[in-house]
């Protein structure tokens, strides 16, 4: 949303004077892509390779759970080292309280990270129950679609891939899940 806000404010409204027409067109096209991700719309699908190099499809993964949390993180990010395990603990509690099964599609959103650093992060924080770990690498279309230019980020989808929450937090996840229950009654 922050990236979209900047494009809207400075490019779309004409405040930016140093970019040429072609550069502005590219950014406006990106804005259109970002704005396609609306709550209750089908999420932009992601197919990325896991730690063993096998492609993992987000929507197919999501079908195995009541809900799936899409997690963008960087193993070297200090904030991620706190927030990702905190979200994992929150999910464990919510699964018991709400009697739901929540999958975690965790995306390593780091440009220059070694496979060992990536796997060490997963193991050190015990991020293994109902997880698929994939790496984003330099995939800009996915990064743009999810406005994943900061870490960590959390998105919530249902088993059909409907986007229920964007950029949520461990604090707000319970509210988002209860809201999803009420919407489908």
Set out the residue ranges of the language-model regions.
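Oxidative protein folding and maturation machinery
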Residues: 1-56
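Short, small/polar residue-rich loop motifs at catalytic or cofactor-binding pockets
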Residues: 42, 66, 149-151
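Short acidic-hydrophobic, aromatic-tinged amphipathic segments that line or gate anion-handling sites
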Residues: 49, 130-137, 167-168
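Short active-site neighborhood of thiol/selenol oxidoreductases, capturing the structured segment around
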Residues: 57-88, 105
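Extended hydrophobic-aromatic, low-complexity segments
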Residues: 70, 78-83, 115-118, 164-167
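Structural microenvironment flanking redox-active thiols in thiol-disulfide oxidoreductases
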Residues: 82-124, 138-143
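Thiol/disulfide oxidoreductase modules built on the thioredoxin-like
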Residues: 137-179
